[in-house]
């Protein structure tokens, strides 16, 4: 997550750089983002709840002089708040260009969706059925107990809170689109069957993604 702030420095502060999280998928060619970027802006990104989101950014590296070592140092010395960093509020001098949600669509596909972001970790389609390998934050024992009781007595409950395995994505279009991307990548030899078997054996992907 933090490595996104290394990109301008890594590219010697040159060119425009598209930075995306690994759980973002291109459903269409994202090159139009160049046209939607204002050359007077430091970066372009999507806003949610009036906050700029840093998981997908087009950064003008010639204008954005982030020093990764300094950022990390300030973060661990509590000089920068983590949420402020993620929401790009750590630098109030940034000139941010707001672009459409089609470039960072959270778990839904619309006609204009270009970049699909699978934000809910427990329903990421390539993990379906595997044991959860992350810690669920901000959950009390009472919350978990309450959901288990609801399940036992057969009433509606929050599966995400108590599931020990990754769940099926609730949006069939999202699930099918990502499955098709995996199959297309295999067909185009970006990886082979041996690679797939290795990642399945290491519990990095579920075999269900190729069904």
Roles of regions detected by a PLM:
Residues 3-49, 57-64:
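GT-A fold catalytic core of metal-dependent nucleotide-sugar glycosyltransferases
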Residues 51-52, 111:
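Short, solvent-exposed loop/turn segments at the edges of secondary structure
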Residues 52-54, 94:
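Short edge beta-strand segments in beta-sheet-rich domains
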Residues 54-56, 114:
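Small-molecule pocket liners
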Residues 56-57, 86:
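Detector for methionine-enriched segments
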Residues 65-211:
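A glycosyltransferase accessory/donor-loop signature
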């Amino acid at each position: 997550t933090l490595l996104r702030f290394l990109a301008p420095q890594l590219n010697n502060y040159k060119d425009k750089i598209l930075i995306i999280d690994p759980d973002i998928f291109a459903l269409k060619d994202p090159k139009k983002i160049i046209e939607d970027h204002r050359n007077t802006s430091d970066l372009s990104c999507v806003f949610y709840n009036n906050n700029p989101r840093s998981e997908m950014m087009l950064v003008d590296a010639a204008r954005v002089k982030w020093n990764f070592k300094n950022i990390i140092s300030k973060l661990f010395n509590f000089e920068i708040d983590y949420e402020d960093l993620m929401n790009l509020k750590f630098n109030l001098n940034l000139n941010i260009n707001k672009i459409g949600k089609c470039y960072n669509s959270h778990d839904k596909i619309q006609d204009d969706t270009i970049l699909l972001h699978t934000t809910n970790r427990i329903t990421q389609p390539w993990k379906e059925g595997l044991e959860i390998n992350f810690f669920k934050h901000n959950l009390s024992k009472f919350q978990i107990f309450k959901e288990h009781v609801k399940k036992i007595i057969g009433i509606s409950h929050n599966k995400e809170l108590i599931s020990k395995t990754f769940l099926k994505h609730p949006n069939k279009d999202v699930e099918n689109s990502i499955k098709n991307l995996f199959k297309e990548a295999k067909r185009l030899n970006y990886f082979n069957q041996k690679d797939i078997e290795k990642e399945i054996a290491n519990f990095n992907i579920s075999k269900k993604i190729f069904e």
